[in-house]
Amino acid sequence: MAGASSYFSLRRLLLLLLPLVPLLGATTAAAAGANSSVTYDHRSLIISGRRRLLISTSIHYPRSVPEMWPKLVAEAKDGGADCVETYVFWNGHEPAQGQYYFEERFDLVRFAKIVKDAGLYMILRIGPFVAAEWTFGGVPVWLHYAPGTVFRTNNEPFKSHMKRFTTYIVDMMKKEQFFASQGGHIILAQVENEYGDMEQAYGAGAKPYAMWAASMALAQNTGVPWIMCQQYDAPDPVINTCNSFYCDQFKPNSPTKPKFWTENWPGWFQTFGESNPHRPPEDVAFSVARFFGKGGSLQNYYVYHGGTNFGRTTGGPFITTSYDYDAPIDEYGLRRLPKWAHLRDLHKSIKLGEHTLLYGNSSFVSLGPQQEADVYTDQSGGCVAFLSNVDSEKDKVVTFQSRSYDLPAWSVSILPDCKNVAFNTAKVRSQTLMMDMVPANLESSKVDGWSIFREKYGIWGNIDLVRNGFVDHINTTKDSTDYLWYTTSFDVDGSHLAGGNHVLHIESKGHAVQAFLNNELIGSAYGNGSKSNFSVEMPVNLRAGKNKLSLLSMTVGLQNGGPMYEWAGAGITSVKISGMENRIIDLSSNKWEYKIGLEGEYYSLFKADKGKDIRWMPQSEPPKNQPMTWYKVNVDVPQGDDPVGLDMQSMGKGLAWLNGNAIGRYWPRISPVSDRCTSSCDYRGTFSPNKCRRGCGQPTQRWYHVPRSWFHPSGNTLVIFEEKGGDPTKITFSRRTVASVCSFVSEHYPSIDLESWDRNTQNDGRDAAKVQLSCPKGKSISSVKFVSFGNPSGTCRSYQQGSCHHPNSISVVEKACLNMNGCTVSLSDEGFGEDLCPGVTKTLAIEADCS
């Protein structure tokens, strides 16, 4: 169990032995006795007879590889987590009806054991509908085609399959004795997902379905409570929970249930063609502090590590292959600083008052028009206060218990003894890490040479079906591939061609199309994350007589949620040609021939054992700007042990594999220059995904994570399928590495030692504020690029001196830090000497390189 007890004083520990209040609405654990019971009352989850304040972290096992799991879980624990939470991904585990898969990235038991071995609890969100920006919301596509099946309503075929899979997962966990009632570590389970927001759209079948789902879950006899997020009418004893950027005002639907937050979004997902969302750590911390101050007892970050949508697992549609989410642990498994460390310090500060928060009495004190205190006191004399300033513009000085406190706008100060500020959400003490992607050209990796395979434009092999008019793309492919060829022929009277500007008009439900006329590419068109359907006009050169039109329809992930989402289709809906003496040729009702997938897919050219397939044609130099081309090249392992990304900026759009492992869809689609980006990010005020965006005018995703465990010591095969055309000679592997570290700390920042603080200390617990810098293991601070002690301004890599600057700044910092792996610099007078700017609040800003 993650470390809460280390923060308790002896007196507080003794109080845990006192009789507990009667438990209301509790679910009683079954088999393993009181020591493993998980129940709840109105205040919190109760584990082994003790109320618990819990920090939970979402890590989705299929979005990383098993070799990464131990480090990810360890980073969550080091960040202050008590729990790891994950969805269960039905379509990954049952890709065909009755055929189960629990290997490699989908080895749920292995992942759960790693969590258990780390001493953490687990929250299992079975769903089995999960949304999660995962293709088809995690539900298998084959289920949509099971006779009579309608998803997520009072439909017997759907409920039968849902119950069968839920039972399969529960039985698997029981077999491993993972539920807390068996002495294991799973303390909560979830059924369904955010259905309350959909009920109105589903009509009369909605409520009976929701009540059935709850009843079905309870009948599984797990011995632990069940939750339903965003399910406002969740029946007792199922706990309804909150998902949002802020949940401090949330109230459960019964006074007997505790206040749980299953999804606090520390960032947001990204779609191809848009800029990058960023949620400032100050605002994430603000939301968490407000939640616990207002009586919350379990909070989960969705997601703490987002990872990667490998292969064709992205949803949306148009969700990027990266599921980085601006999470505290980035896509590559590295700490995102300062976010990770700022939240770690927040968790420590809250945990200092855990007993008082859970067993004490609460009161509310107004400190001003938009300033307030939530105060908790217990019988032992414990006192914890959350001082809040919800004004989004103005800093305030407030008086609480005869003391003055500085409260920045949109911030919360945590006082674990109602006197000393242990943490303020707006004052970030942690260093910032600046990451670089360091390239290693494929040519420098002893490349054996390139081979290619060119796709035919249109029908290859036998025709799969012929129809007058259009078929739906997804209904035809059953999501076995992204690709479906639509091909037709038509005759043109030569007398109608003279002087005309001929235009091809295409309408599509989504998601993308490439058009070929008479075996030549004439254009491409795409929808986007906010609108999958599109129409496009392309100039064409017709010829007298017979013309052949081949349209390649493409999907970019399937719909992952929304009312009746399984009926969202894709594919061509209208094709016309204009420009012939005011005559329009409507091809929509023509005879169309269809071919599912690509020839290279049929021959599995992406598989590791297909490297010597005779269809591969060796090339001394790979062709450039060639559409519909497969590329194969042998590569060495990038040096070092840094995480690796595949730089695809030189390519168009397609799919990539290493040694048969599906890296995923790549598409360095450029976001608009005007896509909501701002020169600076103000954390203050309510956050939305449209705020604090970055990367306008840049590729949405340039680098694609390639786990190091996918590389062999030698003889690695990289396979690329390129749809549009690009320059494969400029593809590189890049190592993700720390380039520089920055810090910006003022003298009034909280400086209590959170590891050793005790509320019974006789002094105020304060030392001078400090800047702490550290480079990764094996690196040291090689140069100090900027330093100013005074009133500097700016952000990392753009700091500027202010009107107050101490001349000893550089010498003090270089003496402490240069050639060191890490260093600490105090903002005390002893360090910098004479105060040259009396009355000015001193700040120390540093930027240093690591090498």
Curated annotation (Swiss-Prot):
Transmembrane segments: none annotated. It holds the Pfam family GHD. Its main location: secreted. Keywords: Apoplast, Glycoprotein, Glycosidase, Hydrolase, Secreted, Signal. GO terms for biological process: galactose catabolic process; plant-type cell wall modification. Its EC number is 3.2.1.23. Glycans are attached at residues 35, 361, 475, 528, 533. The active site is at 194 (proton donor), 263 (nucleophile). Belongs to the glycosyl hydrolase 35 family. Residues 1-29 form the signal peptide. It catalyses: Hydrolysis of terminal non-reducing beta-D-galactose residues in beta-D-galactosides. Gene3D superfamilies: 2.60.120.740, Galactose-binding domain-like, Glycosidases. It comes from the Eukaryota. GO terms for molecular function: beta-galactosidase activity; carbohydrate binding. GO terms for cellular component: apoplast; plant-type cell wall; vacuole. It comes from Oryza sativa subsp. japonica. This is Beta-galactosidase 3. It is found in: Secreted, Extracellular space, Apoplast.
